[in-house]
Amino acid sequence: MHIERLDFENSPYLGVYGFATDRVAVIREGLGEKKLATLREVLKVPLIETSVMKSRIVGIFVAGNSNALIVPWYIWDAELDFINAQLREYGIDMEVVPFQSRLTAFGNLILANDKGALVSKDFTREEARKIEDILGVPVERGVIADYTAVGSVGVVTNKGGLVHPEATDEELEWLSDLFKVDVYVGTANMGVPFVGSCMIANSYGVVVGHLTTGPEIVKIEEALGFLG
């Protein structure tokens, strides 16, 4: 099973509440065991259930790739300690970096895989260079379909990418070159263009909001490399 519909307390915006890499997934607290089991089965990585500043919208705040996770500088010490302890328990050697910036919604503002990263043009060039050092991949600043919240309007793994349907052909070519995967346009949750907010994905699988239609699922499967 590489794709599954799911809701988090009737919300179809799964990407707001979680984030996944090919090594670990960070998920909001308070989900039932049945949904956690589905996440484990689909994403095939350990789950860390946590909060950021006691907020459950951890997908808004956390970004990264297989090399590192970036979290807001104001994350509580207890939360940071818990994430690091969980990584150690799972035997995962991954840095978790509280990043100093006036921007904090990193899940909305950073789109990354293990080949490259796109960060919002709202980051300074110096911040982009620091993010490049943390994630260990080339970083570019920019927008997708005129949106600065590149993590909200896109999802990318090491197998493929899906972005806002208004992205241009030139943007798709640029993103494919940056991430070294094919990137398509599409929607989720019955026409929502903010695909990054609608799903949690890695190279092993993807969980999508429960409102996502059959045709949307086919497109998501194609874009993220699960067909053929």
Curated annotation (Swiss-Prot):
GO annotation, biological process: cytosolic ribosome assembly
Pfam assignment, any one: eIF-6
Gene3D superfamilies for this protein: L-arginine/glycine Amidinotransferase, Chain A
Source organism superkingdom: Archaea
GO molecular function: ribosome binding; translation initiation factor activity
Record's keyword terms, sorted: Initiation factor, Protein biosynthesis
Keyword set includes Protein biosynthesis: yes
SMART domains with a match to the protein in the record: eIF6
Membrane-crossing residue ranges in chain numbering: none
The UniProt record lists the keyword Protein biosynthesis: yes
NCBIfam families: eIF-6, PRK04046.1-5
Reported function: Binds to the 50S ribosomal subunit and prevents its association with the 30S ribosomal subunit to form the 70S initiation complex.
HAMAP family named among the record's database cross-references: eIF_6 (MF_00032)
Similarity remark: Belongs to the eIF-6 family.
UniProt-recorded name of the protein: Translation initiation factor 6
Taxon lineage: Archaea, Methanobacteriati, Methanobacteriota, Thermococci, Thermococcales
